[in-house]
Amino acid sequence: MVYDLDMLKAFYASFEKKIGRVRAVLQRPLTLAEKILYTHLYDDALLKKYKRGEDYVNFRPDRVAMQDATAQMALLQFINAGKETVAVPSTVHCDHLIQAYKGAGPDIATATESNREVYDFLRDVSSRFGIGFWKPGAGIIHQVVLENYAFPGGMMVGTDSHTPNAGGLGMVAIGVGGADAVDVMTGMEWELKMPKLIGVHLKGALNGWASPKDVILKLAGILTVKGGTNAIIEYFGEGTASLSATGKATICNMGAEVGATTSLFPYDERMKVYLEATGRKEVAAMADAVSADLQADAEVVADPSAYYDRVIEIDLSELEPYINGPFTPDAATPISEFAEKVLAHGYPRKMEVGLIGSCTNSSYQDLSRAASIARQVDEKQLSVAAPLIVNPGSEQIRATAERDGMIDAFLKIGATIMANACGPCIGQWKRHTDDPLRKNSIVTSFNRNFAKRADGNPNTHAFVASPEVVLALTIAGDLCFNPLKDALINQEGEKVKLRVPEGDELPSTGFTQGNPGYLAPAGAQVEIKVNPESQRLQLLAPFPAWDGKDFTDMPLLIKAQGKCTTDHISMAGPWLRFRGHLENISDNMLMGAVNAFNGETNKVWNRLTNTYEGVSGTAKQYKAEGISSIVVAEENYGEGSSREHAAMEPRFLNVKVILAKSFARIHETNLKKQGMLAVTFIDKADYDKIQEHDLITVSGLADFAPGRNLTVTLHHEDGTQDSFEVQHTYNEQRIGWFRAGSALNAR
């Protein structure tokens, strides 16, 4: 079924004309990203040349997607917007709240019961306001979007940082916070700083054990976790045509791990075949008709350095598998060097669990190639040394994989087939372990591997690889095993080698839908109820407006040391149940951040009691006494998920300022949307001047203006002071949000 066909017809009917107008204004060859961005300006009158990395631009995305953990807060905000229906096609996907424990059937039953209040709320709000609703078990948001909604040349936003997955079908798909999604759903302009462009030239074709996952694992090592910040990664070159649409999606998905605004590939035959295989021949035909404009112009490809801000070249034919980690996705190591790294760093060598699936690697091709490794266990009389967990990406993938024997291949080697949901990838894993703090190693085909993320254990060394490499290491049970060259000892004592993985890009007999789990909206007669006594859901009260004064004598809540992701700021896992209740989820605020003064988590000095207490509890005491506070952090603060709770919680607990060395893009926007002051050090050495007992003043707010620095004064306990300037990236509109108390208040 083709969803929103009228919208798609209108889009493609006007696409060439819009491109023509863009060419007339810019007067130069265009990259694919530019074509999509400039044809999605909020109003034709906005068409002019914008400076990349500097100018803020108003856009009109084509659609919105939300997952159940972030949709709660987004829809609570949408309810307050006073609209009768959404302005653009929108969907909600129930994939984050299902805990992986016993297997798909019992886990979905448990989730349905334990999350009934939240699911009913999301279903009713969706039905009331014209939003498509995908039930628990239907699939992971990004796989379902790729199978049903993504289209070449389009633009979408999603309340999940891995929304760029849709770039595998040539779409500019951007992860945002809920407040941004509300802007789009209410028909307002959606603002974004015009991204810089990183061009990645792909040459050759993959071979052997190398997979699309290895392209982005290698690139993560080149760019690091913040190298793509405020940039779009655009892939081009002859190598792109050798990759399947789902392989392209894998690469775009993990662009989030380098901080990229989004990633995308040019339209080609592989995308066309995928659209047709997923029941969208009509969409493929419309894209074919404008295919010349669904890729970078020939002049761009011929001289990329003249059009991209940075160009990186990767030869696919020379690429080997990578294994990234632990604790950060940019710790990239080719498999030929990985054993040496494991031994040199003393990582736990024993591979304890292999996990495949997630939104990054759960396509038909992924499972097909992994199953080809699993089948060799019986064929070569091997034993499997570690447990295997499989999360299919959607019900369509699961049902088709079951029909084609892949699920059986996994079950035969002892795998547990979990729900078509995120599960362990976002911390929804009730792991079978007798010691939750034991030092151990796991390897996954997921996208992130932050400490505590998968199972809550800070000593779990999580590594990221392709599904086929995960399978090989699961069989071996040894991180030092290299399937490209090492042999295994089978049950007969013989040395055997695993064959190179193989698998079909798409099912030769077509997909089978299984039980798709889609619920179309019913309309305005649906009543929305929120129990005021609920511990899961809470209607939102507006945040107070700025009082017109400088922030004076604020105690330091925490000076965070090292990596401070959204997982550190607002943990997922068991806390997901409170994602619709701001007061309750605020109890986890910054509990994972490391205090620079004692090296501990969730233990900060409380000025009121002169004792060390939890971060949230301390902030609550300050709030109760009418005291504002400040958080100080290092680089790339807010890296990771799009969850706006990481911005709303400090706002709710009266934290006024986040002062960091740098911010991750989505989180910085989320802070601004909630009326927070997000500023950065001009001289990063000033971070070291901040002392634990300081009272901190931020002045200059009466003259708050774009490009004008603010002043921070540190009042030290010994009576001395330090003062320095800090910078910000607020424009006039965002300063308006700050003054109003939030973007919603400023409507």
Locations of regions flagged by a protein language model:
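Long, structured ligand/cofactor-binding scaffold of large enzymes
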Residues: L8-F11, F15, G20-P195, R579-V631, ...
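Acidic, glycine-rich flexible loop/linker segments
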Residues: L488-E505, H667-W737, L744-A746
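Flexible inter-domain linker/hinge segments
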Residues: L5-M7, E16-R21, Q27, I36-Y42, ...
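Extended active-site and interfacial segments that coordinate phosphate-rich ligands
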Residues: G167-P195, P467, I569-N588, R651-K656, ...
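Extracellular/luminal Protease-associated
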Residues: F236-A241, A624-F663
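Mobile "lid/hinge" segments at catalytic clefts and subdomain interfaces of large enzymes
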Residues: Y3-D4, D68, F151-A285, L382, ...
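Accessory "access/gating" subregions that flank catalytic or transport cores
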Residues: A109-E113, V118, R123-S127, I131-V157, ...
